[in-house]
Amino acid sequence: YTQSITRNHRTAFILAIDGSGSMAESILFRGRCMTKAEAVATITNDLLFELVERARRSDGVRDYYDIAVVGYSGDDEVRSLLPGGEDLVPVSALAAQEMPVHTEVIEHRLPDGSIALREIPAPAWIKPLSAGQTPMCEALRRVRDIAAGWTSRTANAESFPPVVFNITDGEATDCDNEELRTVCDQIKALGTVDGNVLLINIHIAAGDTERPVFFPEAHEARYTNRYASLLYL
């Protein structure tokens, strides 16, 4: 991958967010106890905010990338979580909308070493969701179609390829392991002149491991959580 991300060679960020019932389970995140759904919503909103700010220049927000956020939950429900329900929007369109804000409580270390809680405003485009099943396969098919449409455009032919993040805590309820691998392979087979689409799975787990594992090698991926093992093998 060598292509720089510019207005003439934009890229795309596509997020698939698990909103199934198990996302109501509590975890420790940033020093506070919250549900997995709340943690994922916070991470996603922070990422969207950072993407907007990184594209901001003196003349406004420049379209360095397009953004998609697909949620999957409920009774095989797959839908866009972006305001307005569009599958894919340029970053300037997201920035142009009034940003929903909620109050977030964070820990703040005082000069004497003690910890105090502080309330700060935080972006809230994405709301926490935890209900029903995990139609991951259908969500990834939706992601595949979004990525296929994006990479097929002549204007994107030489661009840095889309980056896909799939954030989940469990196994798909709408397909078997082989079907899941197949749709993932279909996503990774898409690309531009610069290279193939990057698919990054992020597994959210409570108490399975003492430390986060980033880009696991084969022996690291085979840890006790069988759901995570499938995502990384």
Where is each model-derived feature located?
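Acidic, low-complexity intrinsically disordered regions
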Residues: Y1-L233
